[in-house]
């Protein structure tokens, strides 16, 4: 019983100390983070409006205020939110339905306005009419045309609205054709580009002729307060409609500021006073733990079967060999701290010496119990075990015993590229930087065009470029890589990678491609020449005070691109014409418009002086992206795996 009380207390405290990141796949009575107003109710999903009644409004909001921008620097936060929904338009047979729902950001502690049903979407009313009484930005899925403020050229629409019922940007959308289908939405705010984008798709009824993305340039730090409430609002008017929120995921790059909603306080009082209620809740939690544990055991058994199959395939192959955990622990002195080369999100890398091979190796040890780590282990072993190229880190062996997952690579005595560019290791001479750039490009050419399948790496960055004893570049870390057919276009993989290196269309659509890898290569090339990071990381927060691509493009427009050369190179000397060529190729590869980016082969031709240096626009273009789900084949699913650019070695 004491353990149950401790567990229950931990469950109560946990939401108030975590960062701004949550993932709710089911809305039940045990989900305390969500506050409901108006007609909104939770019964597994959130019923924002009841289809059996007219003139209704409902809110479901996150119960803590979310920091949107830093008051000290006025720099906004990147954020992304994913959610799934279902709209019931069954009453279309009676003439119409309405009015839709919206995801909104508004000041903290606001309440559902009175008399805000119908076309007001629960955000406005007759007194404030088309302008909100409080700062407000929202994305609306509007199913009913109100001629006073809605666009007249479409029946229903998806819009991005800035403090007004009139959409700042919109596109047509037909809710009838998607009746009862599950819609899945991604909303992303790129604070560096001030770009708020939304894209959506449907499980069964996606239409290739229908627009499915939208974006709007807005500086949220100029519109909204530093701390906001986020949530959903839906209404019905004289006609009815069912709006259900099925799941919700949110992630932000600023830390959470804790506030306690009054209704949470009341719940705490009730729990504290009612012993019987506490016992019931304890019983419920215990039952839930037992249920989840059994479910986890079943899933683990399936994973074990899958891993066993993979182990057998690897053991039959002629590639990397299998090692015992005992041998690897001995090689790395039981994985002592003084053997640690670097640490990332899913484990650490250690230096070791294998007596059986008489050689130094790097041992990547995945964190125990990490599901993502297991997936990365499987992905990396399956892909890299078949690859052979002088500019790829060579996989020597692997180990899977119980819950331990390890990979053994050739040892890179000169460490990672980022340690030389941004860390304390000796700086790199100009001819070495040129060799590294061409080596990385050669590795990418092999992955994209020369191997039997196209490999999209998805996490090309300076910390994943290793340097051997002769400072040859070796691309590593294939845990996020995906295999694709050469003839297919961008594939839906889910957002993964590192902010600062991810292409804008990849952030907006979640579709990885050879072009998104080329963008990352362009950013790394600019880092190599300038010695500057793609984004700055200060006090644990990502603050793109100077976005490298934007700054370099500005200098290019002024004809001053060469002034950005790494100051360390001015001591040992460099080829100015060659440096300018590398910078322009870097910008070309990091072009915001995916259709204007070169292939890696074209970039290599310019770097080798086999083709002329391209002429780029003097001002950095702003591209928008159309998301169509009809022409792609999904190769992966699941949540986002995103890290932030830093000076750490590896992921």
Swiss-Prot record:
Signal peptide: 1-19
Residue intervals on the Cytoplasmic side: 291-651
GO cellular component, one term: plasma membrane
Extracellular side: 20-269
Gene null: resulting phenotype: Increased susceptibility to the oomycetes Phytophthora brassicae and Phytophthora capsici associated with reduced expression of some defense genes (e.g. PR1, PDF1.2, CYP71B15 and CYP81F2). However, normal defense responses to the fungal pathogen Alternaria brassicicola and to the bacterial pathogen Pseudomonas syringae. Susceptibility to P.brassicae and P.capsici is enhanced in plants impaired in LECRK91 and LECRK92.
Membrane topology: Single-pass type I membrane protein
InterPro entries, A to Z: ConA-like_dom_sf, Kinase-like_dom_sf, L-type_Lectin-RKs, Legume_lectin_dom, Prot_kinase_dom, Protein_kinase_ATP_BS, Ser/Thr_kinase_AS
UniProt cross-references to PROSITE patterns, sorted A to Z: PROTEIN_KINASE_ATP, PROTEIN_KINASE_DOM, PROTEIN_KINASE_ST
Record GO biological process: defense response to oomycetes; plant-type hypersensitive response
Other facts noted in the record for this chain: Both lectin domain and kinase activity are required for resistance to oomycetes, but only the lectin domain is required to trigger cell death.
Protein name: L-type lectin-domain containing receptor kinase IX.1
Organism in which the protein naturally occurs: Arabidopsis thaliana (Mouse-ear cress)
């Amino acid at each position: 019983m004491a353990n149950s009380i401790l567990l229950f207390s931990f469950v109560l405290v946990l939401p108030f100390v975590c960062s701004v990141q949550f993932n709710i796949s089911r809305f039940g009575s045990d989900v305390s983070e969500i506050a409901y107003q108006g007609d909104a109710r939770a019964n597994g999903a959130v019923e924002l409006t009841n289809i059996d009644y007219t003139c209704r409004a409902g809110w479901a909001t996150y119960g803590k205020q979310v920091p949107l921008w830093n008051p000290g620097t006025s720099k906004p936060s990147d954020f992304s939110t994913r959610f799934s929904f279902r709209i019931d338009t069954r009453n279309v047979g009676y003439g119409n339905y309405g009015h839709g729902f919206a995801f909104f950001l508004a000041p903290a502690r606001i309440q559902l306005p009175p008399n805000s049903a119908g076309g007001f979407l629960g955000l406005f009313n007759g007194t404030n009419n088309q302008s909100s009484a409080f700062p407000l930005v929202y994305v609306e899925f509007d199913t009913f045309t109100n001629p006073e403020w809605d666009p007249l050229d479409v029946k229903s629409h998806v819009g991005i609205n800035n403090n007004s019922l009139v959409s700042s940007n919109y596109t047509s959308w037909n809710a009838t054709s998607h009746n009862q289908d599950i819609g899945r939405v991604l909303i992303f705010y790129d604070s560096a580009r001030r770009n708020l984008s939304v894209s959506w798709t449907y499980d069964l009824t996606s239409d290739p002729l229908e627009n499915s993305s939208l974006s709007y340039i807005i500086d949220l730090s100029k519109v909204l307060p530093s701390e906001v409430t986020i949530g959903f609002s839906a209404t019905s008017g004289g006609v009815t409609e069912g709006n259900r929120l099925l799941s919700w995921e949110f992630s932000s790059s600023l830390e959470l500021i804790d506030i306690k909603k009054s209704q949470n306080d009341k719940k705490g009082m009730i729990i504290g006073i009612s012993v019987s209620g506490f016992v019931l809740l304890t019983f419920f939690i215990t039952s839930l733990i037992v249920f989840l544990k059994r479910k986890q055991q079943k899933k683990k058994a399936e994973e074990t079967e899958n891993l066993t199959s993979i182990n057998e395939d690897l053991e039959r192959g002629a590639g990397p060999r299998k090692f015992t955990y005992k041998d690897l622990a001995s090689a790395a002195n039981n994985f002592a701290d003084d053997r640690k080369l670097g640490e990332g999100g899913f484990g650490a890398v250690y230096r070791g010496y294998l007596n059986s091979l008489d050689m130094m190796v790097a041992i990547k040890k995945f964190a125990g119990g990490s599901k993502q780590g297991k997936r990365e282990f499987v992905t990396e072993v399956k892909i890299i075990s078949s690859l052979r190229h002088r500019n790829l880190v060579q996989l020597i062996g692997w180990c899977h015993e119980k819950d331990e997952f390890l990979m053994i690579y050739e040892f890179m005595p000169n460490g990672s590229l980022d340690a030389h560019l941004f860390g304390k290791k000796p700086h790199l001479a100009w001819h070495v930087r040129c060799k590294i750039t061409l080596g990385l490009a050669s590795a990418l050419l092999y992955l994209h065009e020369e191997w039997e399948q196209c490999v999209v790496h998805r996490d090309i960055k300076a910390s994943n470029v290793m340097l051997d004893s002769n400072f040859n570049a070796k691309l590593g870390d294939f845990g996020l890589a995906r295999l694709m057919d050469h003839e297919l276009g961008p594939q839906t993989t889910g957002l993964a990678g590192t902010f600062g290196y991810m292409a804008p269309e990849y952030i907006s659509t979640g579709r990885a491609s050879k072009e998104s890898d080329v963008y990352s290569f362009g950013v790394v090339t600019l880092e190599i020449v300038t010695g500057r990071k793609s984004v700055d990381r200060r006090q644990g927060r990502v603050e793109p005070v100077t976005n490298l691509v934007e700054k370099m493009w500005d200098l290019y427009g002024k004809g001053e691109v060469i002034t950005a050369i790494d100051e360390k190179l001015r001591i040992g000397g460099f080829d100015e014409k060659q440096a300018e060529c590398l910078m322009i190729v870097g910008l070309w590869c990091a072009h915001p418009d995916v259709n204007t980016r070169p292939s890696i082969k074209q970039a290599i031709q310019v770097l080798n002086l086999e083709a002329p240096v391209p002429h780029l626009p003097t001002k950095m273009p702003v591209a928008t992206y159309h998301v169509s789900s009809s022409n792609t084949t999904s190769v992966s699913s699941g949540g986002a795996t995103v890290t932030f650019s830093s000076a750490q070695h590896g992921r």
